[in-house]
């Protein structure tokens, strides 16, 4: 830590979202930090001049990037050419990422003070902004479709052009979700795209449902479902169909539609499932987030 306080140094402790300066195994520190920030260990790049430490982390955390940095004179060159920190697009949410990670650490600390999880959620004083797609957020929405893997039921990816086409089409019910709480703004964290059936006007098929890992377990998915059903009712939709396509990373949402009250109507040999929800009689499920709807009449 002393090195970060050197008067001629460029970095300060506040430049880091988390600092682990202890004698614990480094793979354990990576796992602990990932849990604190609510991200995957696959999001980390581990840089160490000790080959033994690099081998341990590589063996314990297969998804963590561990570059072979070699000689001291090669450090900057290896990291610069690795591509780990390249980005094709930079959204407004990206610029706030460090602040968002710090806020997540504060939430984790606050949660430890509650025995009842529902009470903890209420204490966050959450407000969601949910509405139709806006040009202001299209870049972030497209980015999410190509990054989110855990809470992503179909893992369908979209290019900017494809998302623009969805935005300009009347065939779709489109929802983005932003989540705020007393610790800060989480940004755009949820996306749902449902396509109406040209032959059966009472049917809506969910083509995409995803949520950023930074807001998992905060009931944002319930708020999104309530808003989706509300918009479906306005369109005269009677049935909403959802699909789950399993991948190595999205097992956490395998039972999502069932938990929402959807009826399973099919399953193939690969585990792909289809689900149906009758809109009539649906009761709102969100009880902890105040929702402010935007851009919908």
Where do the model's predicted regions map?
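Extended, hydrophobic alpha-helical segments in both membrane/secreted and soluble proteins
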Residues: 1, 30, 46, 53-54, ...
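Substrate-recognition/cap helix-loop segment adjacent to the acidic, metal-dependent catalytic center
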Residues: 1-21
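Glycine- and acidic
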Residues: 13-18, 205-214, 238-243
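Conserved Lys-Pro-Asp/Glu-containing loop-to-beta segment of HAD-superfamily phosphomonoesterases
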Residues: 30-51, 57
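Terminal substrate-recognition subdomain of acyl/acetyltransferases
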Residues: 36, 58, 62-124, 230-297
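Short, high-confidence coil segments that cap the C-terminus of an alpha-helix
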Residues: 39-41, 171-172, 234-237
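A conserved beta-strand-loop-helix scaffold within acyl/acetyltransferase catalytic domains
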Residues: 129-214
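Conserved acetyl-CoA-binding loop-helix of GNAT-fold acetyltransferases
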Residues: 216-230
């Amino acid at each position: 830590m002393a090195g970060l306080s050197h008067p001629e140094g460029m970095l300060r402790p506040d430049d880091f979202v988390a600092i682990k300066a202890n004698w614990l195994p480094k793979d354990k520190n990576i796992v602990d930090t990932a849990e604190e920030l609510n991200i995957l260990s696959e999001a980390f790049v581990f840089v160490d001049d000790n080959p033994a430490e690099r081998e341990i982390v590589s063996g314990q955390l297969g998804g963590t990037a561990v570059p072979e940095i070699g000689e001291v004179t090669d450090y900057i060159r290896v990291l610069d050419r690795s591509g780990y920190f390249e980005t094709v697009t930079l959204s407004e949410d990206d610029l706030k990422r460090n602040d968002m990670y710090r806020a997540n650490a504060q939430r984790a600390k606050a949660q430890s003070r509650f025995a009842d999880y529902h009470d903890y959620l209420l204490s966050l004083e959450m407000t969601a902004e949910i509405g139709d797609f806006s040009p202001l957020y299209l870049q972030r929405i497209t980015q999410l479709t190509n990054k989110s893997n855990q809470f992503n039921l179909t893992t369908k990816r979209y290019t900017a052009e494809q998302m623009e086409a969805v935005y300009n089409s009347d065939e779709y019910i489109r929802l983005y979700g932003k989540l705020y709480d007393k610790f800060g703004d989480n940004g755009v964290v949820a996306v749902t795209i449902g396509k109406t059936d040209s032959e059966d006007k009472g049917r809506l098929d969910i083509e995409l449902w995803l949520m950023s890992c930074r807001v998992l377990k905060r009931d944002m998915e319930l708020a999104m479902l309530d808003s989706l059903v509300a918009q479906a009712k306005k369109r005269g939709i009677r049935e909403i169909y959802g699909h789950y396509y399993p991948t190595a990373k999205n097992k956490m949402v395998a039972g999502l539609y069932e938990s929402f009250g959807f009826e399973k109507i099919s399953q193939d040999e690969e585990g792909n499932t289809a689900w149906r929800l009758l809109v009539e009689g649906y009761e709102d499920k969100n009880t902890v987030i105040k929702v402010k709807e935007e851009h919908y009449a």
